[in-house]
């Protein structure tokens, strides 16, 4: 493809990666394809430290030295702290400590272990409530877990919502949690975890899973915590700590918002990408 583009007049070719290239880089023959892409382009982008390291393993040393970090930026005018009192009231959450989680309902996103952690959380925070936003093939299994633990009154399934509504729903939470985990011997992982950054932009502390590049979206103990996605003790400990400490929640939420505005705004990454294209 690159040779055809150059014959057509392309002077500079940059290949963008999006996260799934991590497993490409580990599996034959896709790793050879990645190596060829690296050799025939002027630069290859990566999302964060985890994806950069994984992809570099499939490239030649020369190609890996041309890699540049280009991450998806966050629209901080869209994702920002909002007053969600009316939404909380409409959802029956006025007097609840709300854990909000946004993501496709699939195995590796960790909604199952959030539900499994709820009995431990409720033992210390009786008014805790888990709000799951998203849809996916794991829905029936998650609903069966809610039935198993008899926590129907403590878990809400919202389903899919519109992008325009997302900040309002995130801000309806006291904290954001998605304890994602890696699967298939590390081939199925989080490339970065944009939703953690969106939650930070909304001023919420986050609890993220130690899967792939998800930790790149959290400053540990500053904007939130990283936990093992299958450890209910770790998950519940961090969630309880945040739900019981309003001052800590505000401190981490404010730090997260400041970090996103400083380092993750889409304008910043657009400018870096334009510079990369210009050479």
Predicted regions mapped to residue ranges:
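Donor nucleotide-sugar binding/catalytic pocket of nucleotide-sugar-dependent glycosyltransferases
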Residues: 12-15, 35-82, 93, 157
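Nucleotide-activated donor-binding/catalytic signature segment of Leloir-type glycosyltransferases, i.e.
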Residues: 140-165, 175
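Short hydrophobic beta-strand element within catalytic cores of glycosyltransferases
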Residues: 196, 201, 205-208, 218
């Amino acid at each position: 493809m690159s040779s055809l583009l150059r014959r057509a007049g392309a002077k500079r070719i940059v290949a963008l990666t999006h996260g799934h290239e991590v497993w490409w880089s580990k599996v034959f023959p896709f790793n050879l394809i990645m190596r060829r892409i690296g050799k025939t382009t002027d630069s290859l982008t990566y999302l964060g430290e985890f994806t950069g390291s994984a992809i570099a393993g499939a490239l030649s040393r020369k190609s890996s030295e041309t890699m540049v970090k280009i991450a998806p930026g966050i629209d901080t005018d869209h994702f920002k702290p909002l007053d969600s009192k009316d939404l909380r009231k409409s959802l029956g959450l006025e007097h609840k400590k709300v854990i909000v989680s946004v993501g496709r309902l699939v195995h590796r996103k960790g909604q199952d272990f959030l539900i499994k952690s709820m009995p431990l959380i409720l033992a210390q925070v009786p008014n805790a409530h888990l709000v799951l936003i998203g849809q996916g093939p794991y829905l029936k299994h998650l609903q069966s877990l809610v039935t198993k633990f008899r926590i129907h009154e403590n878990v809400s399934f919202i389903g899919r919502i519109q992008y325009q509504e997302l900040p309002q729903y995130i801000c309806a939470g006291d904290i954001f949690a998605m304890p994602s985990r890696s699967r298939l011997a590390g081939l199925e992982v989080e490339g970065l975890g944009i939703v953690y950054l969106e939650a930070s932009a909304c001023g919420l502390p986050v609890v993220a899973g130690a899967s792939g590049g998800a930790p790149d979206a959290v400053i540990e103990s500053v904007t939130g915590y990283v936990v093992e996605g299958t450890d209910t003790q770790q998950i519940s400990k961090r969630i309880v700590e945040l739900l019981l400490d309003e001052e800590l929640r505000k401190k981490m939420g404010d730090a997260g918002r400041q970090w996103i505005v400083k380092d993750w705004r889409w304008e910043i990454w657009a400018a870096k990408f334009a510079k990369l294209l210009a050479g």
